[in-house]
Amino acid sequence: MSKPVEFEMLVDALKSLPGVGTKNANKWAFFLLQQDQKYIDDLIKRIKEAKTNILKCKYCANFTNKDECDICLNEYRDFTKLMIVTTNEDLERIESANIYNGLYHITNGEISLRKNVVIEHTNIKTIKERVLNGSFKEIIIATSYTHDGEVTADYIIRMLEDIKDLQIYRIGFGIPLNSSIDYADDETLKQSLINKRKIRN
């Protein structure tokens, strides 16, 4: 049975969300169209308010409503350690596991020729300047164990190779191949940090 073109356009828009396939997109589209106008207006309003008022920390790119996020402002964090993660979800996942007390740097993407994602499309290019301007002694690269994640990790390692007195680590065994941090449980994350591989002294 054919559906109105507007319905198909809504489904296509919903499919652009992470992890949403055709089946769930259709389910959500039917759900939204069955709601009253107030529900739709409130939903749109909240999305617009979040997009307008939520900023990115000027240091790590974490979501905040100030120039600096609570993590970067927390004087009890270990300012000698910097963990490089791909997404805000990765940061939240590690924080919820309560296994790390350093600072973060969110790349907002991984280098991918397949997806046409280059350095300029990410926050990778700001890593070196931040390391040079900070007091970091240890860098932990926690990009995913996918092809794109490995390419990104290698690029970051090369970018930082001329900085003296900097130890560089890659998260260790525990995170499955072709997987990312947000799918790992607390124990797996803990083991990946315990077993982190030293890339450079």
From Swiss-Prot:
Q: Name the protein family.
A: Belongs to the RecR family.
Q: What are the UniProt keywords, alphabetically?
A: DNA damage, DNA recombination, DNA repair, Metal-binding, Zinc, Zinc-finger
The UniProt entry, under SUPFAM superfamilies, shows: Recombination protein RecR
Tell me, which GO biological process terms does this entry list?
Answer: DNA recombination; DNA repair
- Give the boundaries of each C4-type zinc finger: 57-72
Against CDD domains, the record matches this protein to: TOPRIM_recR
Q: What is the annotated role of this protein in its UniProt record?
A: May play a role in DNA repair. It seems to be involved in an RecBC-independent recombinational process of DNA repair. It may act with RecF and RecO.
Cross-referenced Pfam families: RecR_C, RecR_HhH, Toprim_4
**In the UniProt record, what gene is named as encoding this protein?**
recR
Output the lineage of the source organism: Bacteria, Bacillati, Mycoplasmatota, Mycoplasmoidales, Mycoplasmoidaceae
Organism, scientific name: Ureaplasma parvum serovar 3 (strain ATCC 700970)
Identify this protein by name.
Recombination protein RecR
Q: Which GO terms describe its molecular function?
A: DNA binding; zinc ion binding
Toprim domain boundaries: 80-176
Has UniProt tagged this entry with the keyword DNA damage? yes
